Amino acid sequence: MLILPTVKGEYQKDYNLKHLTWFKVGGDAEIFFKPLDSEDLASFLIQNRQKLPITTFGAGSNIIIRDGGIEGVVIKLGQNFSNIEFIDNHLIVGSSCLNYNLAKFCQANDISGFEFLVGIPGTIGGGVAMNAGAYGSEFKDIIVRIEAIDFAGNFRTFTNAESGFKYRGNNLPKDLIILKAVFKVNKGDSENILLRMNEINNTRSLTQPIKERTGGSTFANPEGLKSWELIDKAGLRGYRIGGASMSELHCNFMINNGDATSKDLEDLGDFVRQKVFEDSGVELKWEIKIIGKYV
């Protein structure tokens, strides 16, 4: 019998994760845990002593969960981890805050430099973890430091430099759960900020399948190249496997056409990688995270 650590938050067993992902695919979490607060999370981790495997889960926007589900404990930080505070000319933002919500907060408070977040689905924690970026800006451009907890239950802080940000990644330890990000603040004009955000939203509407079941950019851009151009050159715009296809509108976006499985999506992505390599000699790297067990 599985004995779980005593917590104040909520456990659910065999919890279906499909409805939490943007692709609407995937299996169950063996254990799903939403901690009450940082202290509750630390207590769980200390009691667990790294015995049960741990997977962190954000907004589900840039992820494929395999159909066999996830062993161990899936930890999702809820609304209690989404606060936005303005202290000493810095923004302190909980990791479960949506990027869009932070962009809107900054616009309402005449804070510039966060406009690009309106075009990035997902949470602050996920954005930090992958150094997400769009429209000429990345998380590394605005972060001062990161507050996190490791799987042993130790609270840790990393400066921007210590985080080792790089294109769609960082050099942070892998056994971290990001709790907060601290951002520098530059004042701007609310109307100009709103204009830029509207420009970004309009561009997304015209060039990306934002109304479809998708996970955002499928592959990271190789240095000096565009993934969508390589995919298009290989003749894969609109290509379909099962219920999954490459978008006709933007062929670096995969779409669940309504009946796709996780296997359809992963098989399609692997097929695209193979064909692009055969056509251009370039090995595309997944930008979407794939986790879980095969059926």
Curated annotation (Swiss-Prot):
Record key words, sorted: Cell cycle, Cell division, Cell shape, Cell wall biogenesis/degradation, Cytoplasm, FAD, Flavoprotein, NADP, Oxidoreductase, Peptidoglycan synthesis
Reactions mediated catalytically: UDP-N-acetyl-alpha-D-muramate + NADP(+) = UDP-N-acetyl-3-O-(1-carboxyvinyl)-alpha-D-glucosamine + NADPH + H(+)
Chief localisation class: cytoplasm
Catalytic residues (UniProt): 168, 217 (proton donor), 287
Matching Pfam families: FAD_binding_4 (PF01565), MurB_C (PF02873)
GO MF assignments: FAD binding; UDP-N-acetylmuramate dehydrogenase activity
Gene Ontology BP term (one): peptidoglycan biosynthetic process
Cofactor: FAD
Pathway(s) where this gene product acts: Cell wall biogenesis; peptidoglycan biosynthesis
HAMAP family recorded: MurB (MF_00037)
Protein purpose: Cell wall formation.
Protein name: UDP-N-acetylenolpyruvoylglucosamine reductase
The species this protein was found in: Rickettsia akari (strain Hartford)
